[in-house]
Structure formats: structure tokens, C-alpha cells
């Protein structure tokens, strides 16, 4: 009856969900959960399952009713765990038409993103996206403008803890820093060198390039972070059998392939002598520009010394 890990339960829709479930916030999810729970009464569930053919109901009817009731009762826990997985890093997608993207640093913990459609003459039309992000739920927002000449305006009087990436398109975009006191430092801009970046006083960071890859959007980019257990066994004539284990933890990040970081920790101990070794290996992608970083820490405590003295007259002590 239990859904052990709801983000994994929705594995097959992991790309779809990160395209079409980017606007609802925590309050929207909580409202929808309550609506579903109020609608799925015990009577409604029982009435639906009781319509099954008798031979089918006899096999799984009661179990299905109990499972549905249990999942309804626990829907808040399952759904909010899934929401938190989706909300951690959010893609805000424009279209191949002109848009105005407003990024407002409301406070150090809140950022509001609003997307307006622009007419061919540049007049502001209807809102096509509006969401206020909180730092408790969201660590990073990635805004993709795509084609046509888009405008991005950053405003607010305080730097937010929510990081924002603006990824423009192949046409001439405009990015304006309307903040006070350099409050756009949480924003990074990725676009062509033809992009207009407002004034020289802009406080956001920019990475401009004529390489078309700078504007790339990969709808299948999402990967789950993975924690794997490791086991190990070995043997040598001095210490005998070594047994041990550890873990490997892989984290993924934006435009970091094949991963952002990978940590591997192993520990082994000799059953007979008590000798042990501990090894940590870390790999980090694109730490500085295109430069990667690797780190290795190896700790050993041997219990056997095979040094018997200098020269050819030394005696081999078997013990």
C-alpha cells in the first residue's frame, strides 16, 4: 500500500513533469491535494470498485479498496515529497515568440518570475506564466527565452538566495538590471555576444559566446542523484582476507556531464590481523571553467612489516 519514494514512482514521466508542472507552487499543490481527498470518499471508492466483474472483485477487489483508501489518506506526504523534488530546480520556458520576462527579488527568500507575451510592436499583452519561488523549496531557476527578441528585466532591492540562470536565444535579446545596491548578483546570463546587457553598472554575471551551444535547451537533461552501496573483498598472503564496504554518491548539475560530482568512500579490514584501509575519491566537473578537479585520500594501517634489514645477509623471518 505504501509508496516508498514518490519521485521514483513517477520515473517514466520525469521529463514531462519538469516541463508541464513548473508553475504550481506549494499552496497550489496543497489545495489540489485537499480537493482530491475530499472527493475520494470511502463511499466513492467502494462504489467504483464494486462495479468490477464478480470474478475480478473476488480476487483483488478488497485489497484494491484498502490500497486506494490508504494512498488517499497519505496523499499529502506522497505529493509534497514529489513537489519538493520538482521545485528544487525549475525550468521556466518561453516560446519562439517575443516575451518579456520579469525577475523580481521580493526578499532574500523570495523571487517572482512573470512572463508576458509581447506583440510584434513590443506592447505588453497577457501573462503566460506567474510564480513566486521561495528559497525553502527552490535553489535554482533556469529561464529559457528561446527564439525571437526577448526582454529580461531584473528588479528588487535585495539579493535573493534563489539563484537564477537566464538562457537567451539566437536572436538579439535585451537584459536590464533595474535593481538597487547590486541586488542582481544571484542572476547569471548565458547568451550570444549580440545580447544587449543594459548599463555597465549591471550587477548580474554574464557569459556571452557566439557558440550556439550557449543557448541549448535539453528537455531530457534531468537525472536523479544516486546513492549506491558498495561491497569489497580481497586477500593477500600476509593479512589474509579483507572484507569491507562503502558507498558511491553521484550528484548531477546543470550542463555538467557525466555528473557534477561523484564521491566514493571505501573501508576494508583484515579479519586475521586487524589491518585496515580507508580510501576516499572525489571527482568534480567544471570546477573552474572547463577544468575538472579530482581528490584522493588514502589512509592505511598495516599490521605486517616485511622489512628484515639491509643487505644480502638479512634473515627472512617467516613470523
Question: What kind of region is each of these model predictions?
Answer:
Residues 5, 29, 52, 254, ...:
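A residue-identity detector for tryptophan
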Amino acid at each position: 500500500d505504501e509508496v516508498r519514494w514518490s519521485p521514483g514512482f513517477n520515473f517514466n514521466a520525469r521529463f514531462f513533469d519538469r516541463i508541464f508542472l513548473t508553475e504550481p507552487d506549494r499552496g497550489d499543490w496543497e489545495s489540489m491535494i485537499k480537493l482530491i481527498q475530499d472527493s475520494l470518499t470511502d463511499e466513492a471508492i467502494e462504489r467504483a470498485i464494486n462495479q468490477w466483474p464478480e470474478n475480478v472483485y473476488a480476487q483483488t477487489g478488497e485489497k484494491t479498496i484498502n490500497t486506494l483508501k490508504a494512498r488517499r489518506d497519505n496523499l499529502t506526504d506522497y505529493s509534497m515529497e514529489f513537489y519538493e523534488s520538482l521545485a528544487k530546480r525549475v525550468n521556466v520556458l518561453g516560446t519562439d515568440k517575443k516575451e518579456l520576462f520579469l525577475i523580481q527579488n521580493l526578499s532574500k527568500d523570495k523571487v517572482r518570475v512573470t512572463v508576458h507575451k509581447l506583440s510584434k510592436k513590443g506592447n505588453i499583452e497577457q501573462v503566460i506564466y506567474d510564480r513566486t519561488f521561495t528559497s525553502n523549496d527552490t535553489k535554482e531557476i533556469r529561464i529559457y527565452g528561446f527564439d525571437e527578441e526577448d526582454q529580461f528585466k531584473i528588479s528588487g532591492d535585495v539579493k535573493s538566495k534563489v539563484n537564477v540562470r537566464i538562457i537567451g536565444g539566437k536572436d538579439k535579446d535585451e537584459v536590464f538590471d533595474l535593481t538597487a545596491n547590486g541586488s542582481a548578483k544571484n542572476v547569471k546570463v548565458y547568451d550570444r555576444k549580440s545580447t544587449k546587457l543594459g548599463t555597465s553598472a549591471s550587477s548580474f554575471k554574464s557569459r556571452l559566446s557566439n557558440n550556439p551551444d550557449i543557448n541549448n535547451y535539453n528537455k531530457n537533461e534531468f537525472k536523479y542523484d544516486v546513492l549506491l552501496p558498495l561491497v569489497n573483498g580481497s586477500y593477500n598472503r600476509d593479512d589474509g582476507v579483507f572484507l569491507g564496504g562503502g558507498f558511491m554518491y553521484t550528484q548531477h548539475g546543470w550542463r555538467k556531464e557525466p555528473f557534477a560530482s561523484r564521491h566514493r568512500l571505501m573501508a576494508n579490514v583484515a579479519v586475521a590481523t586487524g589491518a585496515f584501509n580507508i580510501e576516499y575519491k572525489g571527482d568534480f566537473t567544471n570546477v573552474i571553467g572547463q577544468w575538472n578537479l579530482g581528490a584522493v585520500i588514502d589512509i592505511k594501517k598495516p599490521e605486517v612489516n616485511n622489512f628484515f634489514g639491509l643487505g644480502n645477509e638479512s634473515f627472512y623471518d617467516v613470523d
